[in-house]
Amino acid sequence: MKKQKGYLVFDIGTGNARVAVVSVTGSVLTVEREDIEYSTETLYPDSRYFSPQVLWKQVMNLAKRALSRSCDIDIIGLTSTSQRQGIVLIDQNGNPFLGLPNIDNRGREWEAGIPDWEEIYSSTGRLPTALFSALKLYGLKQRQPSLWEKTASFTSISDWVTYQLSGILTYEPSQATETLLFDVKQNTWSEEMCDIFGFSPSILPPLVRAGTAIGTIANEYASELGLSINAKVIAGGGDTQLAVKSTGAGLEDIVIVSGTTTPITKITEDHGDTKHKAWLNCHTDQGHWLVETNPGITGLNYQKLKQIFYPNETYEVMEEEISALAKEDHACVAALGSYLSAEKNALTRGGFLFDAPLSAHLKRAHFVRAALEEIAFSIKWNFDILTEVTPFERDYVWVCGGGFQSKALTQYIADLLQKKVYVQEGYHQASVVGAAVICNETFQLTEEMSANVRVIEPKDCQIELALYEEWKQTQRFFSGSESKVLI
């Protein structure tokens, strides 16, 4: 029997690393995952890092496990996707030696001292905050000069994976967008941005578009994984861009991706002024951009609350208990992030507001539902900002990502936005499926991927809109000052 063709996809998220085997038809056949081990760098108030050597050993073991469960697949290509903003530093000998994830904020102390904010925004499509890679490097240079001197180059986490597999160092534009060193409108590295941050352009790898066959798998890893030495290593892209790609959404569509954060994106051919209210990103499709608003950390908060309130239960149990609550029974309101602030992922005070003394009817489900509603409210807030920047008249939005495994969240979005919600089959593994889509384009395969789309219709939302207003007041309460809140 002839083996089915497929791909080995590495997906390095914020919370965990995954390796999947995906068929050319987009079916995710096996997925293996483990949490990523981060360490804290005490030289900074808010810093995380990881060991590339430890993570590489981890993902190779995941790859072996995934392949062992997919014996009837002929792997013709390998690719990768990852969290955006995260980077891996490489020394003069070509050895990766330090990983800085998206949640590393070591550059925050120097944000205010960065000059030429308007020039940076005009060129890169974002303001210089600690979220982006250049500020991570800048903080390293200021406080850990010995590590900076050791740095010959750096690349995104997804491009680090393809570097490991092929031995060829590249940077893909949808990831380069997140560095603050990339001219997003011209799709090229910016020497002017390097000058602003005091970096030599020599640290920047060659740019390679998503879907480019970089090379073939190194003999060492072909042998270790039991793959053909002819298997191609293909440039991947940012997890948001590949998730958007998986939906099949077209120009001018809006796609909401619910994961660690929740990007709300519009696909466009235009790279006009985003008025300091949105980011402008390269898409994996040449000539297309994504205009994005993003509330910051969302799904990661929900995951942590599960660990607190439902440590031994599944998400399905959480969903059942949430659905058992009366629609009008809102015993508490959540404020778990600076969702109305211009600064994403900033450290802030937060919590839940509820009546005191505690009601005998207050249950754990009230807290997790409040957190889920907050994700929906933060999406509405950012959706409204996005549609101010770039008008949107369609009666639907696309959604994807693991967060939309919650039927409650999906219905909240339909109700609050008063839009139909389109959910493509495979939505919960969107970045992995999107990786298979770009690989198919590389191999010029025309296999039909699933076109099964579920449609969620909006319902009356008067209760939700009233709660939305209450949530905004709760955000004000925890912000401590209305001047910090964009409302």
UniProtKB/Swiss-Prot annotation:
Signal peptide: none annotated. Gene3D superfamilies: 3.30.420.40. One of its GO terms (molecular function) is kinase activity. It comes from the Bacteria. Induction: Induced by sulfate, part of the yoaDCB operon. It is an enzyme of class 2 (transferase). Keywords: Kinase, Transferase. InterPro entries: ATPase_NBD, Carb_kinase_FGGY, FGGY_C, FGGY_Carb_Kinase, FGGY_N. CDD domains: ASKHA_NBD_FGGY_YoaC-like (cd07798). GO terms for biological process: carbohydrate metabolic process. Its EC number is 2.7.1.-. Pfam families: FGGY_C, FGGY_N. Belongs to the FGGY kinase family. This is Putative sugar kinase YoaC. It comes from Bacillus subtilis (strain 168). The lineage of its organism: Bacteria, Bacillati, Bacillota, Bacilli, Bacillales.
